[in-house]
Amino acid sequence: MEKRKDTKTTLAKASDDRNKAWYVVNAEGKTLGRLSSEVAKILRGKHKVTFTPHVAMGDGVIVINAEKVRLTGAKRAQKVYHYYTGFISGMREVPFENMIARKPAYVIEHAVKGMLPKTKLGRRQMKSLRVLKGSSYAQYEAIKPIVLDA
């Protein structure tokens, strides 16, 4: 922490990635938007007392059971993801049902990415997100993640 002499505001210095805490969040039965906003808060560091908007001080998040996330209302049948191939007439639309079957991690990553800053800082924070299909996160046991009931 650094205290400036001309103001009462205390600013945090850039934190070291080695001291980053990791959290495990189970997406099973959770609503996509509510889950994504909680994950985005942790990635930004807003859960910390020393939160500073321009500093990458967030923690890492591992989301498991990505394929079991749910949507409310008729969105499961109506939600569509758009992407452009780069060719003429290359606009593609993929319904949520197909996307969750083919790439369940993309659904959560896309939602969280929309809730982070659209800057270098947001891209850096996205690197601390891991989304896994299934309930096993054995490859991340070495970092001793904390299981959240968020």
Curated annotation (Swiss-Prot):
Matches recorded under SUPFAM superfamilies: Ribosomal protein L13 (SSF52161)
A GO cellular component entry from the record: ribosome
Disulfide bridges in this chain: none
GO function terms (MF aspect): mRNA binding; structural constituent of ribosome
A Pfam family per the record: Ribosomal_L13
Protein name per UniProt: Large ribosomal subunit protein uL13
InterPro entries registered for this protein in UniProt: Ribosomal_uL13 (IPR005822), Ribosomal_uL13_bac-type (IPR005823), Ribosomal_uL13_CS (IPR023563), Ribosomal_uL13_sf (IPR036899)
Subunit structure: Part of the 50S ribosomal subunit.
Family as reported in the entry's similarity comment: Belongs to the universal ribosomal protein uL13 family.
GO biological processes: negative regulation of translation; translation
PANTHER family: LARGE RIBOSOMAL SUBUNIT PROTEIN UL13M, RIBOSOMAL PROTEIN L13
Keywords associated with the record: Ribonucleoprotein, Ribosomal protein
Primary role: This protein is one of the early assembly proteins of the 50S ribosomal subunit, although it is not seen to bind rRNA by itself. It is important during the early stages of 50S assembly.
